[in-house]
Amino acid sequence: MIWADKHSPKLLKDIKGNFMSIELLVDFIKNFERHPKKSVVLVGPTGSGKTSSVYAFAEENNYEVLELNASDFRNKASIEGFMNSAMNQMSLFMKPKIILIDEIDGLSGMKDRGGAQALAKLMEKSSFPVIMTANDTELSKLSTLIKKSKVLEFDALTSSEVGERLG
């Protein structure tokens, strides 16, 4: 088992730090239909709990997570294919879904022709919460996504918070 997977929190109560951002994330998912923005961008350094928070929420609340790593699907066609499939398919076990797009800052390379714009257009139509993670939102190619999303900041964990998690 990979070390990071072994020590990854499985429940929200196991996540250290970033309590306010996690609380706002939970509110967004639970009240998705009432939010004016249909997506959230979780911004913070690697290891701050962005992706773990989504999976812990899903585990506790019986949601299915459909994950796309943006660095693997960079162009318009591949993003449209994933999003259309995710938005239109029913869960095998009739669970509610979360669409997680990890590392959207990976969309800023030369091969990413139209990827961010396609994603921005599709996420407005989603019947499911779209959650994106990023280390940096200052990239100009992501401005359309950032404007259409609620942004929640995650701070780096302190050494004592990391110690609590490992202890």
Region spans (language model):
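Short amphipathic alpha-helical molecular recognition features
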Residues: 3-7, 13-20, 46, 70-75, ...
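Short, conserved catalytic or adaptor-binding loops enriched in Gly and charged residues
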Residues: 5, 59, 144-147
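Walker A/P-loop
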Residues: 33-68
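Residue-level signature of catalytic and energy-coupling elements of molecular machines
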Residues: 15, 58, 162
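Non-catalytic interfacial helical region
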Residues: 64-167
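Pre-Walker A (pre-P-loop) alpha-helix and adjacent loop at the N terminus of AAA/AAA+ ATPase modules
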Residues: 2-39, 85-92
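Short, well-ordered alpha-helices that flank and scaffold nucleotide-derived cofactor binding pockets
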Residues: 27, 55-59, 121
